[in-house]
Amino acid sequence: MGQTDDAGVVERYLACLAVHDWDGLAATIADEDLIREGPYCDVIEGKQRYLKFLRGVCASPEGYRLDVHRISHASDRVCYVELSETFEADGVPTEYPECLVLEQNPDGLINRVSVFIKQVRS
């Protein structure tokens, strides 16, 4: 197909994200036409801007942890990922459940990341 082994791109992206391996993560995302849509309707366009955003967000919080609960490959180019991000708020580990929609371009690289926050039941 393209430049990458499609079957493992999403899994490698998540593994690199969890350990803050930005060079490894960069190898899983498209150089062109990358768009990240956040849970608050925020949009980041471009590979370098997205990597800069991740470096700032993921490296800062105390006690940061990413746990992947389920990966569902809807097609050869679309994947849903249920995960949780945990970091300390006032010294207390706080978990934030999310769902990501990841889309891959014809070369197998991730070119679209959409982030949805799950609502915690009261």
Question: Where are the regions that the model predicts?
Answer:
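Short, low-complexity N-terminal intrinsically disordered segments enriched in polar/charged residues
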Residues: 1-28, 32, 122
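A solvent-exposed, acidic/Ser-Thr-rich amphipathic alpha-helical stretch
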Residues: 23-27, 31-71
